[in-house]
Amino acid sequence: VINKVVFFNTWHFGDLHSNKEYARQFLEEFNKRGIETCYATVVAGRAINLPVATQNVYDYPHLTGNPVTYFDAMSNTLYINTWIGYYIVMNSHNFTAQKEMWKDIAGKVLTASDGQIIISIDDDPMKYVSQIDNDLLSPVVIPEGKNIIFCNDIPISGQSHNGDWASAINRLANDYPEINFICTKIFENNYNNIYFTNNLTNREQIICDLPEIGYISESCDFIVTNSSGPGTFTMTKNNFINPNKTIVAFVIGEGNTFWNGVDGVLADTSWYNVYDDESVYQILRDKINAKIFHNSS
């Protein structure tokens, strides 16, 4: 008999967002049966609106080694590992891979409950593309005009090359003074049209501003990402189904684009396996000319 369920993730905050709708489905099923459920990370409370454990994941010594989802018969507790990297090999970090992971978790729930808890995962991953919980947001400031958001934090996973594109962004800001360039990682610059999310969100007063970054991205014409945590939070359903949105990912392989294998994406999406600032600059200059100014020069 399962008396308690603890979701945990010892690695990435971005996974909290991409897992959110799956975790909610499981939470609803557990709540129907009166099973106590929580997420063993303090960030989960405001990032994905799920109950948070009284202990952080690192206060569970048996979880820090990143074990597979398992059932502890002594405490009747099911521990569910939600880190995609444990289940899926590299080059498969996307919503389709998340679907396969949660199907596997559903099988473990079925076994741990002696066949009593059946959770069906829909084959359409678009149904699980996450949305931002606007009622949980702290105040944000969004610059007026055309906005491009750069999720240029250094990724801690292997899905992308390291680099913050500072040189490329500075050149673009010089070329296009009428466009606002919003960046998640701070770097040296002298342009009035470069903004940093730390200054647009209430970052100093909250645990993390990833949900706010996702919210800001929905007001941007372009999203430029590298599969970092902030980039993951910009992969929202509103962005996916917006035909006026352009999403560019600089990642190692197509499998690391979140839209890979997802039907119904209306945004203009593209990916590139490059990392040097010159290539990033040239690609984005061409994209901006074509999508915002509607010319190819």
Pin down the residues of each PLM region.
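Catalytic machinery of carbohydrate-active enzymes
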Residues: 1-297
